[in-house]
Amino acid sequence: MASRRVVSSLLRSASRLRAASPAAPRPRAPPHRPSPAGYLFNRAAAYASSAAAQAAPATPPPATGKTGGGKITDEFTGAGAIGQVCQVIGAVVDVRFDEGLPPILTALEVLDNNIRLVLEVAQHLGENMVRTIAMDGTEGLVRGQRVLNTGSPITVPVGRATLGRIINVIGEPIDEKGDIKTNHFLPIHREAPAFVEQATEQQILVTGIKVVDLLAPYQRGGKIGLFGGAGVGKTVLIMELINNVAKAHGGFSVFAGVGERTREGNDLYREMIESGVIKLDDKQSESKCALVYGQMNEPPGARARVGLTGLTVAEHFRDAEGQDVLLFIDNIFRFTQANSEVSALLGRIPSAVGYQPTLATDLGGLQERITTTKKGSITSVQAIYVPADDLTDPAPATTFAHLDATTVLSRQISELGIYPAVDPLDSTSRMLSPHVLGEDHYNTARGVQKVLQNYKNLQDIIAILGMDELSEDDKLTVARARKIQRFLSQPFHVAEVFTGAPGKYVELKESVKSFQGVLDGKYDDLPEQSFYMVGGIEEVIAKAEKIAKESAS
């Protein structure tokens, strides 16, 4: 009983003490400190959600009924707006507009200038400033000068009025033959044809050049690349192709000179006049070729866009007139080089080997427009300069992916005095198939390549041991290979003024028959020098007889 009273009194005293004293604070949990990455992620997520909540429209915008997909369309705005030049750094010009920025790729024209200076919008800087690339020299340009928004991309004249004429990147004639009188104009920035509009057909374009037609034939409506270093004959080969195709097929050609020598452009123009490809004065409408020049003395903006100008002229002949057009680009590497300069001027960080990060995109935008549609075709032959003869350089390597045939010009072959200096083993074509060419042509081409490859394999043995150590079969292989090597040479029409030898156009059937005869050993008794710089096999026989008479006398 006494113990129970003691316990109850202790409980009562404890309760009084608890009521009188303040509540003891609970022990705090250690503060949660998120990691820096988690903190930044949480802040970014909160900001994005709040920004999205503020920017979300109450109702969806009305449909416009046009499906541009954010690509190049005709919906350019702000035509007639006036801006002011606020900064000039070489070929880069910054222009301020008080209201409404012109879209990317819009053409602007500088007012009150001594020449027509076109600027193309490349970047938007802030809310009222654009950075542009000049299509001509910016000498004499001053801050505050007025600039007009044309409301469209660079637009150039197209159609038959351009035949026999030379125009620049913005469509101005530069041949001193007056204005180009036409009602047809097109923007140089256009979408590639849709898949449903494209057509694929396997047909050879006969060039009349033996080594090309036999070993790496060109596809009508395809893309062909001429690879080679400096001075191995790319431009001469292109000039011969223009000459042969104009005479043999009668089709229209467009030549785009991109960043090459002005002297060569002038020589090409004179050659075309002399050969009748271009006619002057009253007969100009009978011309077969249009020339578009943006040579190496032009600013990078002009060189980066002149290829598109030439392509636009060719597209009109294909789409509006249903023509099979030949588009020659000399040199597609200069197109890449100019875009690299523009990229550096715009402050983009360079990619591999100093090229622009958008190398594949720039090239693809041009190449995808060169195609065959159900209306007509564009067959493109592109000279491709190979820096330091390195085919793994990003510029030529990226171009390879777009090509249907490659014609590789070799310095080793040119050093032997064999022109055109086409490498018969490195040059390739998707057309080299028995289903396309037929069994005779295919077997002859492969037979020629096999003999040349065997000769190449034997050259080390010959250099070390000499010809006497070879077997009889190997000696025969070497003799035939040397004849084939020389027989692949050919005098060109456009080189007559330099060599004095008349040019030769060799039909495809004759080429196949002649080389098959060499492989079969029909001409083993003829000296190898009789195969050098001739056309068909009849000329070889005639030259051999002439050599025999000279040696006998």
Curated annotation (Swiss-Prot):
Disordered as annotated region, ranges: 16-36, 52-71
Cross-referenced CDD domains: ATP-synt_F1_beta_C (cd18110), ATP-synt_F1_beta_N (cd18115), F1-ATPase_beta_CD (cd01133)
- InterPro entries in alphabetical order: AAA+_ATPase (IPR003593), ATP-synt_VA_C (IPR055190), ATP_synt_F1_beta_sf (IPR042079), ATP_synth_F1_beta_su (IPR020971), ATP_synth_F1_bsu (IPR005722), ATPase_a/bsu_AS (IPR020003), ATPase_alpha/beta_chains (IPR050053), ATPase_F1/V1/A1_a/bsu_N (IPR004100)
Gene Ontology biological process terms from the UniProt entry? proton motive force-driven mitochondrial ATP synthesis
FT transit peptide: 1-47
Task: Mention any one GO cellular component term assigned to this protein in its UniProt record.
Answer: proton-transporting ATP synthase complex
Give the EC number: 7.1.2.2
> Where does the UniProt entry say this protein principally localizes?
mitochondrion
Q: Any idea which GO molecular function terms this record carries?
A: ATP binding; ATP hydrolysis activity; proton-transporting ATP synthase activity, rotational mechanism
- UniProt keyword terms in alphabetical order: ATP synthesis, ATP-binding, CF(1), Hydrogen ion transport, Ion transport, Membrane, Mitochondrion, Mitochondrion inner membrane, Nucleotide-binding, Transit peptide, Translocase, Transport
Query: Per the record, where are the segments of Pro residues compositional bias?
Result: 24-34
Where is ATP bound in this sequence?
G228, G229, A230, G231, V232, G233, K234, T235
Location in or out of the cell:
Mitochondrion; Mitochondrion inner membrane
Role played: Mitochondrial membrane ATP synthase (F(1)F(0) ATP synthase or Complex V) produces ATP from ADP in the presence of a proton gradient across the membrane which is generated by electron transport complexes of the respiratory chain. F-type ATPases consist of two structural domains, F(1) - containing the extramembraneous catalytic core, and F(0) - containing the membrane proton channel, linked together by a central stalk and a peripheral stalk. During catalysis, ATP synthesis in the catalytic domain of F(1) is coupled via a rotary mechanism of the central stalk subunits to proton translocation.
Which NCBIfam families would you find in this protein's record?
atpD
Protein name as catalogued = ATP synthase subunit beta, mitochondrial
Taxonomic lineage per UniProt? Eukaryota, Viridiplantae, Streptophyta, Embryophyta, Tracheophyta
